[in-house]
Amino acid sequence: MGKLVAIWGSPESGKTTFAVKLATAVYNQFQSTVLTILADQTAPALSVLFPNRKKEDLSSMGMVLAKTEITQEEVIKCIVTDPKRANFGFLGYMDGENVHTYAKAGERKCRDFLNVTKTLANVVVVDCTSLPDNLSKVAINMADEIVRLASPDLKSMAFFNSQLPIMADTSFRCEEHILGINVVRQDVYIPLEEAKEHFGKVSFTVPYSQEIRIQTINGALIEPVKDAKFNDRLRIVAQKLVE
């Protein structure tokens, strides 16, 4: 069974980008089979990662979660792959889909789904929703490692001040979260040290990368990054989470 890594964080903290780049770092560093699950139904990410793919070349994991029984065969059918990399795939929702497209999957079915994905990959990275849906709740509960991602701004601080008390339930395992700060903007003044002081024990900081910003604009997030500082930091984080 593969290792499950859950990425949860505040809105606009760069969770999806971080999840994709972390999966890439794991793939490159450990020569692993890696699956990235994109849980968001409010802004489906498959069309963001694969903007030039025809709709008929993409598949939605919503079709799997809507089935009575979840099998390896059905999950494999819905994996979207990168033609440049073997054993590196994505599961998510398609452009135009939303929370009403498919029947809501219960937590038991989400657990079955995640267990199947763990039989298909060495590492499964789950990009959880900021307000956890059933799939995200189960992923956090099942995860071998949980990353809580914040951005160094007042909005992120306000989000966690509001949501962490709600997540006091032991199933969210807040005391086990690995806290990271992701610098997603290049502002004149970034209150990074103040953010670290506010959030407490910060395990890592992801530096701002102009190259990542350009990839985001161009719909090229699955492409390699040459930014040495960014890559070095992701390698360190990948090693901490996977080894």
List where the protein language model places each region.
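P-loop/Walker A phosphate-binding loop and immediately adjacent motor/lid segment at beta-alpha junctions
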Residues: 102-114, 161-186, 223-228
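Walker A/P-loop phosphate-binding motif and the immediately C-terminal alpha-helix
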Residues: 2-42, 46
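Well-ordered beta-strand positions
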Residues: 123, 145, 201-204
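P-loop/Walker-type NTP enzyme "switch/lid" segment
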Residues: 36-119
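Beta-strand-loop-alpha "switch" segments that mediate conformational coupling across diverse proteins
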Residues: 183-187, 192-224
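NTP-binding/hydrolysis catalytic cores, primarily Walker-type P-loop NTPases
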Residues: 218-243
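Inter-motif core of Ras-like GTPase G domains
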Residues: 119, 134-153
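Conserved beta-strand segments of the P-loop GTPase G domain that flank and frequently precede/overlap
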Residues: 7, 37, 92-93, 125-127, ...
